[in-house]
Amino acid sequence: MTAWVGLTGGIGSGKSAAAQYFADLRVPRIDADRAAHSLTASDGIALPEIRRLFGDTVFDTQGLLRRDILRKEIFASPSRKALLESVMLPLIFSEIKKQQETFTDAVYGIVEIPLLTEKRQFISLIRRVLTISAPLEKRIGRVMARSGLTRGEVADIISHQASESERLLLADDVLLNDGSLKSLREKTMLLHAFYSGIFASKPTQGKHNG
């Protein structure tokens, strides 16, 4: 039975790069954000309920979800955000579980869940938590470089996420991504060897044995 590691981290921490390095090592990779995107893509199963709750204004004339409009609405209103999460989180959970069931031979796999610290229900899907950590200034710089957002906008996004201390408290393992991509790859390879060893000998190793 494949054991699953929940990979998480704040925006700009490098979690997606780390997840890709695991995938390069032929480790099964599941991405919660991709699952969410598929659920809200054309003909996605979440669309009818989103339309019922949020109305036609968040859809274009072709029936496609206007993600920018919806994002602004939920960012401005905690109650609207909670409403969307009531629709999306159970569907994302089910989609991840379905994808996990397609992997049976791998010793372990990676589930990339950016909001794992905030949404603890996903812990039941994993055995260990790996937090990708990085200094705040590096995180801000990375996001500004790739997105064109201002420093203030990035800082605002970070302020709405879980704190670094909260993520570290949840973690079984921490990867400090404070250097180059080469360094990140090397650290990922060390963790790969570690996980391959512990899960081959003790499949339930870790704090999170859901």
Swiss-Prot record:
UniProt keyword annotation of Kinase present: yes
Superkingdom classification of source: Bacteria
Residues at which ATP binds: 12-17
This protein's UniProt keywords: ATP-binding, Coenzyme A biosynthesis, Cytoplasm, Kinase, Nucleotide-binding, Transferase
Species this chain originates from: Neisseria gonorrhoeae
Protein name per its UniProtKB record: Dephospho-CoA kinase
Coiled coil: none
GO molecular function list: ATP binding; dephospho-CoA kinase activity
Pfam families: CoaE
Protein biosynthesis recorded as keyword: no
Catalyzed reactions per annotation: 3'-dephospho-CoA + ATP = ADP + CoA + H(+)
A single GO BP: coenzyme A biosynthetic process
Localization in the cell: Cytoplasm
InterPro entries (alphabetical): Depp_CoAkinase, P-loop_NTPase
NCBIfam families membership: dephospho-CoA kinase
Domain DPCK: 4-202
EC number(s) from the headed UniProt entry: 2.7.1.24
Enzyme class: transferase
UniProt-listed PROSITE patterns: DPCK (PS51219)
Any one cellular-component term (Gene Ontology): cytoplasm
Pathway noted in the entry: Cofactor biosynthesis; coenzyme A biosynthesis; CoA from (R)-pantothenate: step 5/5
Record function comment: Catalyzes the phosphorylation of the 3'-hydroxyl group of dephosphocoenzyme A to form coenzyme A.
